[in-house]
């Protein structure tokens, strides 16, 4: 039984082209349902791909093109709050932020903005180990 993610969850990886994001995206895809990792986001690498996964310039573009409903974030601390807000503003159902070391003030601003928007996005993290539904999905 899945609660947050399952075999139909479609995932965007923000920071997929970095060392950590690439490693963990490959590991998650190897675990189960590789085709459910549908996009990466990196504004400087938009229009390219990694392991056959298209890279988009924004989360909104990735969501519109792929039907993604979740994002996992492997962006360095200085850019992580902006990455979270981009995913929230794209109205994804779930955002999992793996990044650690995000300044507390940045996260207070993120939570405040989520309240202002009346966001329905569930944010797990930051500094989160991810989540798993056995044999269905690992983020």
Across the structure, where does each feature detected by a protein language model lie?
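Rossmann-fold NAD(P)-binding glycine/threonine-rich loop
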Residues: 100-124
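Glycine-rich phosphate-binding loops of nucleotide-dependent enzymes
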Residues: 17, 51-52, 60-63, 67
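NAD(P)-binding Rossmann-fold cofactor-contacting core
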Residues: 27-50, 126
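A short, basic/flexible loop-to-alpha-helix module at the beginning of a structural domain
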Residues: 1-8, 60, 134-139
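General beta-strand structural signal in soluble alpha/beta enzymes
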Residues: 13, 39-42, 95-97, 122-127, ...
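Generic hydrophobic/aromatic pocket-lining and core-packing "Φ" positions
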Residues: 25, 59, 84-88
């Amino acid at each position: 039984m899945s609660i947050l993610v399952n075999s139909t969850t479609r995932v965007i990886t923000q920071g997929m082209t970095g060392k950590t994001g690439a490693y963990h995206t490959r590991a998650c895809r190897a675990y189960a349902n590789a085709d459910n990792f549908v996009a990466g986001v990196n504004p400087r690498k938009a229009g390219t791909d990694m392991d056959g996964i298209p890279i988009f310039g924004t989360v909104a573009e990735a969501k519109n093109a792929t039907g993604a409903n979740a994002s996992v974030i492997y962006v360095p601390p200085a850019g992580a709050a902006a990455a979270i807000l981009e995913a929230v503003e794209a109205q994804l159902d779930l955002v999992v932020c793996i990044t650690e070391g995000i300044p507390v003030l940045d996260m207070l601003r993120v939570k405040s903005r989520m309240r202002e928007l009346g966001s329905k996005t569930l944010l797990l993290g930051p500094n989160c180990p991810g989540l798993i539904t056995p044999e269905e999905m690992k983020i």
